[in-house]
Amino acid sequence: MEPSPAAGGLETTRLVSPRDRGGAGGSLRLKSLFTEPSEPLPEESKPVEMPFHHCHRDPLPPPGLTPERLHARRQLYAACAVCFVFMAGEVVGGYLAHSLAIMTDAAHLLADVGSMMGSLFSLWLSTRPATRTMTFGWHRSETLGALASVVSLWMVTGILLYLAFVRLLHSDYHIEGGAMLLTASIAVCANLLMAFVLHQAGPPHSHGSRGAEYAPLEEGPEEPLPLGNTSVRAAFVHVLGDLLQSFGVLAASILIYFKPQYKAADPISTFLFSICALGSTAPTLRDVLRILMEGTPRNVGFEPVRDTLLSVPGVRATHELHLWALTLTYHVASAHLAIDSTADPEAVLAEASSRLYSRFGFSSCTLQVEQYQPEMAQCLRCQEPPQA
C-alpha cells in the first residue's frame, strides 16, 4: 500500500504488490494522515489510559493516595499526636491521684494511639496495586484495621471493668480529688479536640462511589449514600467512647473532690462508662462484619438493582445477582442477564452497565449476557435468594 496524491493535499492509499516494493512477506503498512511518518512501534508497548473508556466507569486513578485517603491520613496523624501527648499526661495525673478512672481513660487513649497507628498502616497498605494473587488490591486492609481497633478497645475495656469490680469489693484505696479533677478536665478538652480533628468532613468535590462523604446519584434512592473512611470512622468512635468516659470521670472527680467519702464513684464511673464505650463500637462493628461477610452494601437494595436490570429493553430475566462491598466506598456488582433472541447483546450490556453505574454508584460491574431459555424459570440455581 503506497501513498498517492489526492485533493486537498491529503494522501490516499492503494495496494501494492510485494514485487513492486521488494518488501518481505507482503505485509501492508498504513501511514497516518495526521502524524508525521515515524519508526514502527515495538512489538510490546506499555498499556496507556485510553481517551475513551470502553468498559470502565472512571478514569484511571493516579498512583498513591487518593485525596480522600490523604485527608484521612492527615486526620489520623493529627489525632494520634494529640492523643499521645494527653495520654502521657493522664498516666502521670492518674498515678498522682491514685485514680483508676483516670488510668482507665489513659488506657483507652493508649488503645486509641495503637489503633490509629494501625489505621495509618492499613491506609498505606490499601494504596498498593492489585496483583495476580490479590486481584482486588488491598482495599480491605482498611476494614481489617477498623476491626483490630474495635477488638483492642474491647480487650482494654474488659481488663478495666475487672479492675473496677475488684475496687468495689475492696475499699482499701485513696483518691486525690484535686489531681483527679484537674486531669479529668484536661482529658475532656483533649477528647473534644480529637473528635473535632476526626470529624468525617472530606475534601471538596468528592463525587462518585469513592467519595469521602456522599455518592450523588442520578436516579434511584432519594437519600445519598452515607460513606466514609472506615479507619477514620473507627478512630472517631473510639474518641466518642473516650469522651463519654471522660465526662463521667469529670463528674466523679467533682463529687470526690467535694465529698471524699464517696470515693466509690471512681470505680463506679469506670464500670458504667466502659459499658457505654463498648456500645459505641456497635455501628463500626456492624459495618465491618457486613463487609467481611460479603453483605449487600448499605443503602443498595437487592430488589432495586434487580428491577433496574429487568427494566433494560431486551432483558427477560436475571440470575446470579451478587452485590457486595470491598469498603464502605467501593461497591461491586455481578449478574447474568437472560435476553431475547432478537435483542442486541452489546446494546443490552452497555445500557445495563450505564444504569447500574449512574443509579447506584457501583465502582465495578461485571455482567454476563446469555440467551433466555424457558427452563430458567424452573432452574433451582436461577432463582432469587430468599429474604434474610
Curated annotation (Swiss-Prot):
Dityrosine (Tyr-Tyr) (interchain with Y-372) crosslink location in chain: 357
**Main subcellular location of this protein, as a coarse class:** membrane
Name the UniProt key words of this record, in alphabetical order. Antiport, Cytoplasmic vesicle, Endosome, Ion transport, Lysosome, Membrane, Metal-binding, Synapse, Synaptosome, Transmembrane, Transmembrane helix, Transport, Zinc, Zinc transport
Which InterPro entries does the entry mention? Answer: Cation_efflux, Cation_efflux_CTD_sf, Cation_efflux_TMD_sf, CDF/SLC30A
Write out the residues that bind Zn(2+).
Answer: 108, 112, 238, 242
Q: Where would you find the membrane-spanning parts of this chain?
A: 76-96, 106-126, 146-166, 178-198, 236-256, 265-285
What compartments host this protein? Cytoplasmic vesicle, Secretory vesicle, Synaptic vesicle membrane; Synapse, Synaptosome; Late endosome membrane; Lysosome membrane
Residue intervals annotated with topology Lumenal: 97-105, 167-177, 257-264
The region called Disordered is annotated at 1-46
UniProt-recorded Gene Ontology molecular function terms: antiporter activity; metal ion binding; zinc ion transmembrane transporter activity
Query: Cross-link Dityrosine (Tyr-Tyr) (interchain with Y-357): which residues?
Result: 372
Membrane topology, Cytoplasmic segments: 1-75, 127-145, 199-235, 286-388
Q: How is it modified after translation?
A: Homodimerization through dityrosine bonds is stimulated by oxidative stress.
- Identify the Pfam families for this entry: Cation_efflux (PF01545)
> What kind of membrane protein is this, topologically?
Multi-pass membrane protein
Provide the catalytic activity annotation. Zn(2+)(in) + 2 H(+)(out) = Zn(2+)(out) + 2 H(+)(in)
Single GO cellular component term: cytoplasm
Q: Does this entry carry the keyword ATP-binding? A: no
Gene Ontology BP term (one): positive regulation of transport
- Subunit structure comment from the entry: Homodimer; dityrosine-linked. Homodimerization seems specific of the human protein and enhances the zinc transport efficiency. Interacts with TMEM163.
NCBIfam families from the xrefs?
CDF
Similarity comment: family membership: Belongs to the cation diffusion facilitator (CDF) transporter (TC 2.A.4) family. SLC30A subfamily.
Protein's UniProt name: Probable proton-coupled zinc antiporter SLC30A3
What is the organism of origin for this protein?
Answer: Homo sapiens (Human)
Q: What is the lineage of its organism?
A: Eukaryota, Metazoa, Chordata, Craniata, Vertebrata
Gene designation: SLC30A3
